[in-house]
Amino acid sequence: MEESDSEKKTEKENVGPKVEPPLGEPEGSLGWAMPNAAMKKKVLLMGKSGSGKTSMRSIIFANYIARDTRRLGATILDRIHSLQINSSLSTYSLVDSVGNTKTFDVEHSHVRFLGNLVLNLWDCGGQDTFMENYFTSQRDNIFRNVEVLIYVFDVESRELEKDMHYYQSCLEAILQNSPEAKIFCLVHKMDLVQEDQRDLIFKEREEDLRRLSRPLECSCFRTSIWDETLYKAWSSIVYQLIPNVQQLEMNLRNFAEIIEADEVLLFERATFLVISHYQCKEQRDAHRFEKISNIIKQFKLSCSKLAASFQSMEVRNSNFAAFIDIFTSNTYVMVVMSDPSIPSAATLINIRNARKHFEKLERVDGPKQCLLMR
């Protein structure tokens, strides 16, 4: 079918400004380059204006720290002008009088994960005019071939009824155009809620969202840019998009058992999101993975500012030893050992020897059999 002029115009206007590679990651690196033959996964990031979508995306994918998101809009405009991108483009961001970043229309970015997997991220501006256009003139373009819908709710929104209305409109469009899409709801800015009220408020909001989402299923997360909850949510989202995650987990378990590790974690290299893990016994802190992601990512950023690159580290005390090291071209690995009889050198050699196996497994079209055997 031949496209109409209006459809062609919409497609042209929806081409957003180039996304800068993360600090410390050269342009064209594995974390950001567009591959020739990639498995693309379309991810919609939606929510009302000022809900925090662009800030969280910049923290996860562009190595911003929370306090720097207040000047995010001005930074993006500076980058647009420095790249000499046509100022008539409909995609840009501004910061309002209270520091909220507002995205206009749809900003596209491509983020490469684990070899051939590419996240085609659509950050959709949340102004009322644009939201209405998404459900009318741009409906098919926006909601076709979606793998994941992420809808962000400001927990302190004064227009909750309107938020829910737009969310339900998104679900109707998803049901029509991408019925197999996975739905995630992020109840954001939870740091603004009194600590003793957070569990109750989130539980009530989660129940409402699950009810409104039927017949679709939604997964809900409480999030804040000021703690590890943001990493918890996005790690869970990315986990759903990895095509061979079961093979990855099976090999990770075999690796952990062979080297007698208490825990093994895989982090995506650019974002430091947890993409897979294995543990042989329960741990007290259920949020330790996301805390580590947050800490190490900020440490990597500090290294970059000093013109140094983070490669590996070892932490040891009387109870355990933890190793974080480059694993494959797209991942870091963390290995936790509690057996004092196993020397550090042996663990590091085991990590090095396992790299080639996990490099093969990362390929989307790679082998399906278990690569690590006793």
From Swiss-Prot:
Site of the Glycyl lysine isopeptide (Lys-Gly) (interchain with G-Cter in ubiquitin) crosslink?
K203, K281, K291, K305
Q: Which reaction does it catalyse?
A: GTP + H2O = GDP + phosphate + H(+)
In terms of one coarse class, where is the protein primarily found? cytoplasm
Q: Which organism is it from?
A: Rattus norvegicus
A molecular function (GO) held by this record is: guanyl ribonucleotide binding
Question: How is this protein annotated for GO cellular component?
Answer: cytoplasm; Gtr1-Gtr2 GTPase complex; lysosomal membrane; lysosome; nucleus
Q: List the disulfide bonds.
A: none
* Superkingdom to which the source organism belongs: Eukaryota
Describe regulators of its activity.
The activation of GTP-binding proteins is generally mediated by a guanine exchange factor (GEF), while inactivation through hydrolysis of bound GTP is catalyzed by a GTPase activating protein (GAP). The Ragulator complex functions as a GEF and promotes the active GTP-bound form. The GATOR1 complex functions as a GAP and stimulates RRAGB GTPase activity to turn it into its inactive GDP-bound form, preventing mTORC1 recruitment and activation.
Basic and acidic residues compositional bias, start-end: 1-15
Q: In its UniProt entry, what is this protein called?
A: Ras-related GTP-binding protein B
Q: What class of enzyme is it?
A: hydrolase
Its subcellular locations are:
Cytoplasm; Lysosome membrane
Describe the protein's quaternary organization and the partners it interacts with: Interacts with RRAGC and RRAGD; heterodimerization stabilizes RRAG proteins. The GTP-bound form of RRAGB (in complex with the GDP-bound form of RRAGC or RRAGD) interacts with RPTOR, thereby promoting recruitment of mTORC1 to the lysosomes. Component of the lysosomal folliculin complex (LFC), composed of FLCN, FNIP1 (or FNIP2), RagA/RRAGA or RagB/RRAGB GDP-bound, RagC/RRAGC or RagD/RRAGD GTP-bound, and Ragulator.
Residue segments, region Disordered:
1-30
Q: Gene3D superfamilies from the xrefs?
A: 3.30.450.190, P-loop containing nucleotide triphosphate hydrolases
Positions where N-acetylmethionine occurs in the chain = M1
Q: Which residues bind GDP?
A: G50, S51, G52, K53, T54, S55, T69, T75, H188, D191, L209, I225
**Residues the record lists as binding GTP:** S49, G50, G52, K53, T54, S55, T69, T75, G126, H188, I225
Enzyme Commission no: 3.6.5.-
Q: What does the similarity note say? A: Belongs to the GTR/RAG GTP-binding protein family.
